[in-house]
């Protein structure tokens, strides 16, 4: 897969996402985004520990690594 496509999908997840309270860990914040992107791309991002997907979920969570990488991509592309 083209590395730029994967990078830009991560950036879009970040730019369209929001911070919210964790359901599992009270007091912890998570960064969530809708998962309306190519499954192949989402699976690769998860394999690289940049996002966390859920079996029947309509959203994904960006990991700390994913947020850091998205911030780098934001500086690079925007």
What are these regions (language model features)?
Residues 28-29, 55-57:
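Short, surface-exposed loop/turn segments at secondary-structure junctions
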Residues 46-56:
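A short, conserved structural fragment
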Residues 1-40, 76-77:
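Short amphipathic alpha-helical interface segments
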Residues 65-78:
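Short, amphipathic alpha-helical interaction segments positioned at domain boundaries
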């Amino acid at each position: 897969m083209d590395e730029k496509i994967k990078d830009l999908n991560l950036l879009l997840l970040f730019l369209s996402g929001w911070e919210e309270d964790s359901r599992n860990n009270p007091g912890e914040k998570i960064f969530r985004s809708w998962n309306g992107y190519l499954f192949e791309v989402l699976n690769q991002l998860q394999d690289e520990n940049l996002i966390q997907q859920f079996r029947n979920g309509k959203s994904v969570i960006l990991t700390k690594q994913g947020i850091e990488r998205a911030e780098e991509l934001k500086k690079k592309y925007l």
